[in-house]
């Protein structure tokens, strides 16, 4: 009743004054109304569904139906859905464990024995060998034989290297024994430097050596600071001076 009284007063005041209330006044009145009533009341305007006594809805809802606006496309889609089949993008590969789990133990043992007994087929291929300046070609040569050849070649090279090393060491030892020690040679075999005498030289060589010595003597005397006599004249007339000396003519000359 109080709310109806307030509403009537509010309407009457608007009629008498002719002025609109302010926003603050409306807010204050709305807050007072909420404090008194606690809620806005029934604002559903009769659109809410009222439940029956048994707990079921009063107005039972009918099931909704979809309308196909594009019937042609719908039929195509249905056919496509029917045709689609699930594809296994990652197929599970059968493993030995899965097969062995399903098989009995005897079959599993047989399978393992057969797999062990089966040997890989020997593959053949052409083979070329270069040895001692020759080229040897085999058209069909198995891998096992090739391995044997390689092993033999490796053993042969190892043996040849060992022999070469032993030969080199023996040669070095013999050379070291042949070379004399320098200290022993100096003491045992003194150096004998004997100059060859002039008598052993041939006559022609000895005459040329005398001429060379005479010329050298003349050059030495000519380069002296002063000369007592002309060496050319002295060498040309030695006998005349000796013969004339006893006659007392040496002073005049």
UniProtKB/Swiss-Prot annotation:
Its main location: nucleus. A motif (Nuclear localization signal) lies at residues 204-211. The keyword Membrane applies. Jasmonate binds at residue 204. A motif (Jas) lies at residues 202-227. Induction: Up-regulated by jasmonate, wounding and herbivory. (Microbial infection) Triggered to degradation by the pathogenic Pseudomonas syringae HopZ1a protein in a COI1-dependent manner, thereby activating host jasmonate signaling. Keywords: Acetylation, Cell membrane, Host-virus interaction, Jasmonic acid signaling pathway, Membrane, Nucleus, Plant defense, Transcription, Transcription regulation, Ubl conjugation. It is found in: Nucleus; Cell membrane. (Microbial infection) Acetylated by Pseudomonas syringae HopZ1a. Ubiquitinated. Targeted for degradation by the SCF(COI1) E3 ubiquitin ligase-proteasome pathway during jasmonate signaling. It holds the Pfam family Jas_motif. Repressor of jasmonate responses. Jasmonoyl-isoleucine (JA-Ile) specifically promotes COI1-TIFY10A/JAZ1 interaction. Interacts with COI1 and inositol pentakisphosphate to form a high-affinity jasmonates coreceptor. Homo- and heterodimer. Interacts with TIFY10B/JAZ2, TIFY6B/JAZ3, TIFY6A/JAZ4, TIFY11A/JAZ5, TIFY11B/JAZ6, TIFY5A/JAZ8, TIFY7/JAZ9, TIFY9/JAZ10, TIFY3A/JAZ11 and TIFY3B/JAZ12. Interacts with COI1, MYC2, MYC3, MYC4, MYB21 and MYB24. Interacts (via tify domain) with AFPH2/NINJA. (Microbial infection) Interacts with the pathogenic Pseudomonas syringae HopZ1a protein. This is Protein TIFY 10A. The lineage of its organism: Eukaryota, Viridiplantae, Streptophyta, Embryophyta, Tracheophyta. The gene is TIFY10A.
């Amino acid at each position: 009743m109080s709310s109806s009284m307030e509403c009537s007063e509010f309407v009457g005041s608007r009629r008498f004054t002719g002025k609109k209330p302010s926003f603050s006044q409306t807010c204050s009145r709305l807050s007072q109304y909420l404090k008194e009533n606690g809620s806005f009341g029934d604002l559903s305007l009769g659109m809410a569904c009222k439940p029956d006594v048994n707990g079921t809805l009063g107005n039972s809802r009918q099931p909704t139906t979809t309308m196909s606006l594009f019937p042609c496309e719908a039929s195509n889609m249905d056919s496509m859905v029917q045709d689609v089949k699930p594809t296994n993008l990652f197929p599970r590969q059968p493993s030995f464990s899965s097969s062995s789990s399903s098989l009995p133990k005897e079959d599993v043992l047989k399978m393992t024995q057969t797999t062990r007994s089966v040997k890989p087929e020997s593959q053949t291929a052409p083979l070329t060998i270069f040895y001692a300046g020759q080229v040897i070609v085999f058209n069909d040569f198995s891998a096992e034989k090739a391995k044997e050849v390689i092993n033999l070649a490796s053993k042969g090279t190892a043996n040849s290297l060992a022999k070469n090393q032993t030969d080199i060491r023996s040669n070095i030892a013999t050379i070291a024994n042949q070379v004399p020690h320098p200290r022993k040679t100096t003491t045992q075999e003194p150096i004998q430097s004997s100059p060859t005498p002039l008598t052993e030289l041939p006559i022609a060589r000895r005459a040329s050596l005398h001429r060379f010595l005479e010329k050298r003597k003349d050059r030495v005397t000519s380069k002296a600071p002063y000369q007592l006599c002309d060496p050319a004249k002295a060498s040309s007339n030695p006998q005349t001076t000796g013969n004339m000396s006893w006659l007392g003519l040496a002073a005049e000359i």
